[in-house]
Amino acid sequence: MKITLKYFGMIAESLAKQEEELSMEKSQTVSDLRDQLEKIYPKLKSIDYRIAVNQSLVESNYSIQQDSEVALLPPFAGG
């Protein structure tokens, strides 16, 4: 199964990319994906970030489905 990963802000700068496709053998939770990405990109371990799937912030037990768009979002402030 394939998903599209999008990186923003300091995450995109740290990884030197804004987007990529990732193949996964099966459906994974957000927590599983986070673990996998932190093995591929150890720099992510030192960055506080949230994960959104299909433009909605999700919890760590959310199951990611085929063709999902997954965004890694650094801390942000608004008002």
Where are these regions (language model features)?
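Ubiquitin-like/PB1-type beta-grasp interaction modules and other compact soluble beta-rich domains
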Residues: 1-78
